[in-house]
From Swiss-Prot:
It comes from Bacillus subtilis (strain 168). The lineage of its organism: Bacteria, Bacillati, Bacillota, Bacilli, Bacillales. Disruption phenotype: Knockout mutant does not have growth defects compared to the wild-type when grown with glucose as the main carbon source. Acts as an inhibitor of the pyruvate dehydrogenase. Overexpression does not affect growth with glucose as the main carbon source, but it leads to a dramatic growth defect when cells are grown with pyruvate as the sole carbon source. This is Pyruvate dehydrogenase inhibitor. Gene3D superfamilies: HesB-like domain. Interacts with the E1 module of pyruvate dehydrogenase (PdhA-PdhB).
Length: 95
């Protein structure tokens, strides 16, 4: 599995989470919400340090990661995190 954070999404996260180079951001599975890959689950986001990262992506010195224990959620899809100007929020695309 691969994870990509595009530049517009990176800038949104930097502003919203007050991120700096060296920070770490976790994408985690949460119950509820809406997803194209796992019904009844969605992704949450938090500043956190990895315990057992399964996938990482670095952008502008910031490490984005998904724990090994959450990889089931992606069902062998790659994750592209982009940004929607209309919604003014990141968009998760499963490829």
């Amino acid at each position: 599995m691969n994870m990509t954070i595009n530049e517009d999404a990176l800038n949104w996260y930097k502003e919203e989470l007050d991120l700096e180079s060296g920070d770490q951001v976790r994408f985690f599975v949460r119950y509820g919400g809406c997803s194209n890959v796992q019904k009844g689950f969605s992704l949450g986001v938090a500043k956190d340090a990895p315990q057992e990262a399964g996938v990482t992506a670095e952008a502008d010195g910031i490490t984005f990661f998904i724990e090994e224990s959450d990889l089931w959620y992606f069902d062998n899809h790659d994750l592209l995190v982009s940004y929607s100007e209309d919604a003014d929020e990141p968009v998760f695309e499963y490829q």
